[in-house]
A protein has these predicted regions:
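Auxiliary Fe-S-binding modules of radical SAM enzymes
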Residues: 71-180
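Core AdoMet radical
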Residues: 1-72, 161
């Protein structure tokens, strides 16, 4: 298809917890990296992801992704052809850490990446409310607005933001593995 002029970028969607050695094997194969950057707070990383080293692993992984993909490139229709979009999902009660993530990404990468600041955290009935009561609620709209305002105050120009009312179960795909 490429030989006949058809081009579809290869997008690598990841939670951000990737070994640099693994990413190096993808060098030249991936056009757009779409990692999460969940936390800079190691206590949150340990508690919610059982990976206290998540912040350092994710930092190194994102650096490698940016090295490979370079600055964002768009076609004449505005579709991204190359680049990195780092997603950050604001969690309930984690605004301070969200601000630290945004600041780190902006100071480290500036306009070499896009950020996607997400507000759609949705508590699920299956979440152990006794174990994580602080996560058994949606992110208040004012908290998300504070995160967006903070990004703007830093000078972040390349970011996607969400409109309200995205924290619904209808936005969560069914993870049934049916058809796999």
């Amino acid at each position: 298809a490429k030989e006949q002029g058809m081009y579809l970028p290869v997008v690598y969607n990841t939670g951000g917890y990737e070994r640099v050695e693994t990413l190096k094997m993808l060098d030249g194969l991936v056009d757009i990296y779409l990692p999460d950057f969940k936390y800079l707070n190691t206590d949150h990383a340990k508690k919610y992801s059982m990976a206290e080293d998540y912040p350092e692993v994710a930092k190194a992984a994102i650096a490698e992704m940016v090295r490979q993909a370079g600055k964002p490139v768009f076609d004449e229709r505005g579709m991204m052809k190359r680049g990195v979009i780092v997603r950050h999902l604001l969690l309930p009660g984690c605004l301070a850490d969200g601000k630290r993530v945004v600041k780190y990404l902006h100071e480290t990468y500036g306009n070499r990446i896009y950020m996607s600041l997400m507000s759609q955290y949705t508590p699920l009935e299956s979440l152990d409310a006794a174990k994580y009561p602080e996560l058994n609620r949606k992110v208040p709209e004012y908290a998300y607005e504070k995160l967006v305002d903070y990004a703007i105050s830093l000078g972040v120009m390349q970011a996607f933001i969400q409109e309200g009312d995205t924290a619904k179960e209808s936005f969560i795909p069914p993870f049934t593995l049916e058809g796999v």
